[in-house]
């Protein structure tokens, strides 16, 4: 189980680059002007030698310069005492990330309920649709996010559902090793509960199987550790 957790942690780090990153004593500090928690947090990737108190203080100082809260991503492979250290400094649990996996060798390919347009390359149309569905109006985010998607170092599957000329649903599949990760699932509010999300996921999985994927994973973010600062869930 631990080996699979480690694999998915590695895959998810590959899948979603940040605007900028910094390596600090076995930690990765990720910066994206707080577009999402995942792209604007501290992740542990290796052993440390600097005292923990000093490392946390350093991270807080760096993120304060960016004008964003200090967020630490916690995974099941980490020492549970780290949670306590953070709580002693005033941190609290803000979101939980549920990770679901699927054995694609046992998955029965089915035709999606709704037609889905797939592309291997990102397009301005897909990005504008994503921004519209997420309500992204921050000019810095609209400037840096396209480069973050284009920096994904793996093969990609961009999915869109249209109503006329308008994108009403998006999704993204990222192929890495024998896995496909499903990301960026968004559906316009007035079109929800009409199987659009299911159609997007099935289309991505079907395409990934054609590319040789044997495992799928989906991360639904609802929890990270954050300092007591103003914040906005993306």
What positions do the PLM features span?
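Conserved GNAT acetyl-CoA-binding A-motif
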Residues: 66-74, 209-220
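Single conserved hydrophobic/aromatic residue that forms the stacking wall/gate
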Residues: 225-234
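Conserved beta-strand in the GNAT
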Residues: 26-31, 99, 160, 166-174, ...
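A short, internal acetyl-CoA/4′-phosphopantetheine-binding micro-motif in the GNAT/acyltransferase core
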Residues: 43-49, 185-192
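Short amphipathic alpha-helix that is part of the acyltransferase structural core
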Residues: 1-10, 38, 43-44, 97, ...
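Conserved acetyl-CoA-binding loop-helix of GNAT-fold acetyltransferases
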Residues: 54-59, 193-206
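N-terminal charged segments
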Residues: 1-65, 78-79, 83, 139-140, ...
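A short helix-loop-beta-strand connector motif used in the catalytic cores of GNAT acetyltransferases and
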Residues: 15-18, 67-68, 82, 96, ...
């Amino acid at each position: 189980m631990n080996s699979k957790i480690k694999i998915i942690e590695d895959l998810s780090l590959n899948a979603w680059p940040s605007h900028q990153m910094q390596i600090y004593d076995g930690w990765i500090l990720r910066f994206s002007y707080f577009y999402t928690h995942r792209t604007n947090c501290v992740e542990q990737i290796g052993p440390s030698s600097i005292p923990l108190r000093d490392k946390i203080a350093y991270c807080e100082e760096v993120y304060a310069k960016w004008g964003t809260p200090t967020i630490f991503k916690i995974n099941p492979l980490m020492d549970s005492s780290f949670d306590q250290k953070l709580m002693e400094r005033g941190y609290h649990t803000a979101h939980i990330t549920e990770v679901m996996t699927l054995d694609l060798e046992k998955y029965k390919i089915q035709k999606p309920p709704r037609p889905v347009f797939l592309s291997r390359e990102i397009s301005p149309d897909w990005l504008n649709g994503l921004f519209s569905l997420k309500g992204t109006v921050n000019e810095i985010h609209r400037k840096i996010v396209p480069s973050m998607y284009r920096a994904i170092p793996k093969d990609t599957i961009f999915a869109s559902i249209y109503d006329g000329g308008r994108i009403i649903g998006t999704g993204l599949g990222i192929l890495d090793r024998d896995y496909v990760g499903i990301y960026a699932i968004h559906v316009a509010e007035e079109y929800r509960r009409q199987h659009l999300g299911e159609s997007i996921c099935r289309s991505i999985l079907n395409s990934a199987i054609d590319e040789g994927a044997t495992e799928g994973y989906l991360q639904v973010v609802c929890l990270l550790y954050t300092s007591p600062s103003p914040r906005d869930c993306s």
